[in-house]
From Swiss-Prot:
It is found in: Cytoplasm, Cytoskeleton, Microtubule organizing center, Centrosome; Cell projection, Cilium membrane; Cytoplasm; Cytoplasm, Cytoskeleton, Microtubule organizing center, Centrosome, Centriolar satellite. The BBSome complex is thought to function as a coat complex required for sorting of specific membrane proteins to the primary cilia. The BBSome complex is required for ciliogenesis but is dispensable for centriolar satellite function. This ciliogenic function is mediated in part by the Rab8 GDP/GTP exchange factor, which localizes to the basal body and contacts the BBSome. Rab8(GTP) enters the primary cilium and promotes extension of the ciliary membrane. Changing S142G: Fails to restore protein stability. It is linked to A chromosomal aberration involving PTHB1 has been found in Wilms tumor. Translocation t(1;7)(q42;p15) with OBSCN. Bardet-Biedl syndrome 9: A syndrome characterized by usually severe pigmentary retinopathy, early-onset obesity, polydactyly, hypogenitalism, renal malformation and intellectual disability. Secondary features include diabetes mellitus, hypertension and congenital heart disease. Bardet-Biedl syndrome inheritance is autosomal recessive, but three mutated alleles (two at one locus, and a third at a second locus) may be required for clinical manifestation of some forms of the disease. Signal peptide: none annotated. This is Protein PTHB1. GO terms for biological process: cilium assembly; fat cell differentiation; protein localization to cilium; protein transport; visual perception. The record marks G141 as: Critical for protein stability.
Amino acid sequence: MSLFKARDWWSTILGDKEEFDQGCLCLANVDNSGNGQDKIIVGSFMGYLRIFSPHPAKTGDGAQAEDLLLEVDLRDPVLQVEVGKFVSGTEMLHLAVLHSRKLCVYSVSGTLGNVEHGNQCQMKLMYEHNLQRTACNMTYGSFGGVKGRDLICIQSMDGMLMVFEQESYAFGRFLPGFLLPGPLAYSSRTDSFLTVSSCQQVESYKYQVLAFATDADKRQETEQQKLGSGKRLVVDWTLNIGEQALDICIVSFNQSASSVFVLGERNFFCLKDNGQIRFMKKLDWSPSCFLPYCSVSEGTINTLIGNHNNMLHIYQDVTLKWATQLPHIPVAVRVGCLHDLKGVIVTLSDDGHLQCSYLGTDPSLFQAPNVQSRELNYDELDVEMKELQKIIKDVNKSQGVWPMTEREDDLNVSVVVSPNFDSVSQATDVEVGTDLVPSVTVKVTLQNRVILQKAKLSVYVQPPLELTCDQFTFEFMTPDLTRTVSFSVYLKRSYTPSELEGNAVVSYSRPTDRNPDGIPRVIQCKFRLPLKLICLPGQPSKTASHKITIDTNKSPVSLLSLFPGFASQSDDDQVNVMGFHFLGGARITVLASKTSQRYRIQSEQFEDLWLITNELILRLQEYFEKQGVKDFACSFSGSIPLQEYFELIDHHFELRINGEKLEELLSERAVQFRAIQRRLLARFKDKTPAPLQHLDTLLDGTYKQVIALADAVEENQGNLFQSFTRLKSATHLVILLIALWQKLSADQVAILEAAFLPLQEDTQELGWEETVDAAISHLLKTCLSKSSKEQALNLNSQLNIPKDTSQLKKHITLLCDRLSKGGRLCLSTDAAAPQTMVMPGGCTTIPESDLEERSVEQDSTELFTNHRHLTAETPRPEVSPLQGVSE
């Protein structure tokens, strides 16, 4: 609230139950009188137009009869009134009145009164335009730089700008991407129209661009605009303000500069005429109207802002200069010269309270209401407290809002995978080259403790693995029931899945006393499928393109003991070497060293190494656990194969780019196909037969192109899905090698998996490359940052498909480099602080320049040869196979 209230100079109440808005008030010398005094023009939604010329005998007097110069019923709602040079052949001011379906321009002339009734005004219609569309608002100005006259631009409710050159209609243009109309203003300095769209951004359109754009006599679709002649309407500049705008106004202080003022719902903006922000002021209250005006004496631009607290604030830039209290909420505010009094503030409320006031120091008569207090009765408070505590205890007992402990699970879920194949394979519609694809049965058992309704079981496995049934529904009408379902899993397509792990998820709702609909709960149980489901014994290979070596701290184990189900006829040869043949076609060889504690895995494809390597480590852990050995550990001392990993990333990214190009080309051909169809339809409907001019041939050719492109898009999507599966396999392998290389803990491995494997499914809108790049950049900025300077870098907030993969590959290389130099993966708040690390001798700094970064990308595989001396030799806790373990 303000200490002072606005000093009332003149006021009146307009009509009875009439409504007004910000466009209903205007101040101007509408009758072109010689003294230059402004008149108050007010229009209402009831269709009444009034013109006032206040002449109070003393300050604070109400309206007299002679103050009303004109009152006329126009019979149509008045949306906006403006005064300008709207009639050709003269530079006299005329009144423009905007109705919902009509624009009228009137000539207003004053008549001196010879009796006590005072002066009068007469209004004559000069011309009118009937509108084809429902109007919303209008603006005027010297469009195109014309001299001595004003043109009018009307914005319709469906987004069309209609320009009128005085008595004639010029043209109409639709705003692109229009949804809802916003405030409209004209800047004479830049010859542009400014509005605020429903996208919450300020948009500027050049008048010249509007004039030469494609005609909009009827709204055309985007595809027609592309194929038609003429230019498309292009926005000059935009600025996102993040909120809807109440009003927009342009003020020119001098000929060299102008400012665009925008009043938002919570902020007040001042922009340059090129869209750059001069300043912004956050408002602590809800504004209702505003008016920027030039202060010639101070050489600044001041702004009047009214709000819903009956206040009027005066700002000089962002500085509050004065605050005054009004008797009403203003919806429109103007400043003018009335009765030789300059700077009169005229405000209008939505219910017709019109007031002329000026600033002063009359004290506000507002008094705060007395606080109603009552004496406290402590006995009643004790009783109320006990009742509330009882309610809280009841809620805790009924588990209405609190999560239940693990001991009180409503449902137990267990999964058992059959050790043998199905006698009759359940595989159907397979695309694998082998004659017979095996299947294995999985049994899921559910046992309830309480009554549950509509428990839904969903089972998920990694593609190209397929389930015979993946959705089940149960009804547990009585406690302690046991339900068992069975389904089969098999390999559907001819490539290798990225994981052999499946997940069974049960969702249900448990009703309580306070929540009869039930509390939603989810229980999941993971299970592991056997390797032999996708793999057969194969012939070992002596040579291969890709090899990795796993070191252990125990003596080598016979491969026959680790993989008993993959032994062939010559068992003696398979003690130290064993071959595997995936159903998808890949061949992998595992060799156990006779003299050292090492195992080598080799294959022709890099991503095919993952499943066998992971299976080897898991079976080694199981073997030594059965032997009672607790200090078994695996490690990796070779170089991280980043170059092979980057090749898979590039191939996946190339398929994504190719998919975008194919979809864009398909969209263009579809537009062309529909355009030819319309031309043919017009020819067939024509009463006078005309030659088709090979339109039928063109239609047939375009149809074949659309079908071919659709097939190409479908084929590319299949290749992209397969490439993403291979990329996930390679990513799992790289994470495993980094974990063995740096002896990472289970929590640190989980952070790497969350960063490198954030998506279950890859799409064009949100792909693997941009998501992983954002996650790795966050790690480099926080827990792996070198200094506070790196922490201050702002990451891109939008996940867009990148131009190439160079930035992603550079970040992956830096991640490995910083891990090798003592970096610690952690998500705690203190991890973002710079850490002091004692570096061993011979360690170089991280390359930061462009040349160094290029060398890192080229020689990434040579950087990480052996960094075992950087970390202590502590055994890494490994996760046992997840065979039927519920969470």
